[in-house]
């Protein structure tokens, strides 16, 4: 795929994952991702949606910035008004081996526009009429899924190792 991948820098603890980073380092990562897209697309693309694993969202929402009552997530939301949609997806979690084989949390920053990214289903799930076969009733089903269509791959950015 041609979707750009942003590489996280190690924090003061020597690790790149957000569980090991301070609030300032996480904010710097978000700024770095946004600046990376701006530089890569020469300010043409302006992503407005961020997807992250459920457990990471909860962790950032419950973790307080030292000396304040504000959570890391609320601080990031307040200071990145260009990101309007904050979404969670369990498939991006490092613990979900069915969909995520990297062993790391994944983040996705993208432009929520059906012209730039869409899920194509050429044939929706269809159940045919029940048929008697021998001593059982069989219901044949069919469906087709084309997956994600991303005609503008630079309108999204993947981040591994959150």
Each language-model region and where it sits:
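Long, contiguous amphipathic alpha-helices that act as assembly "spine/axial" helices in icosahedral shell
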Residues: 1-12, 38-51, 131-145
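Alpha-helical scaffold segments that mediate packing/assembly in large oligomeric complexes
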Residues: 1-29
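Phosphate-interacting basic helix/loop segments used at nucleotide- and nucleic-acid interfaces
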Residues: 23-43
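Short His-Asn-centered micro-motif
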Residues: 50-55, 110-111
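Short acidic, S/G/P-rich loop/turn micro-motifs used as interaction or catalytic elements
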Residues: 55-63
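Sequence/fold signature of self-assembling virion shell proteins
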Residues: 62-162
